[in-house]
Design a protein with these regions (language model features):
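Nucleic acid-binding interface residues in structured DNA/RNA-binding domains
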Residues: 1-106
Length: 106
């Protein structure tokens, strides 16, 4: 699979994450067919060609942490988008994965 093909598969997976839920970079990598490529998921999302359509704000680190380098407005923007969808937070930088993790691939 080329990196371009992988990026498109990442976008397809992320488009399936329901509003009010989150997935981890590793989870998206697994579902996109490259289970050890969480970092490349980050690269793909940073290059998101359709930010209004591909909800990259719904992808977080394995510990629930939101991305300090969120490409579309920083962590405050990511937090605001997630909270607007009803995602609960354990603290200002970590979503409550127990309450809002998308179960696909687990």
């Amino acid at each position: 699979m080329t990196s371009e093909g992988f990026f498109e598969r990442v976008y397809e997976v992320v488009e399936q994450i329901p509003e009010g839920m989150v997935a981890t970079y590793g989870q998206v990598a697994l579902l996109a067919g490259r289970p050890r490529s969480a970092r490349y998921v980050g690269y793909a999302l940073h290059s998101n060609p359709r930010p209004g359509q591909i909800p990259c704000h719904r992808v977080v680190f394995a510990d629930g942490r939101i991305c300090e380098g969120f490409a579309f407005g920083g962590p405050d923007a990511q937090r605001e988008l997630l909270m607007g969808e009803g995602v609960t937070f354990a603290d200002p930088m970590h979503v409550d994965l127990g309450a809002c993790r998308w179960p696909a691939g687990l």
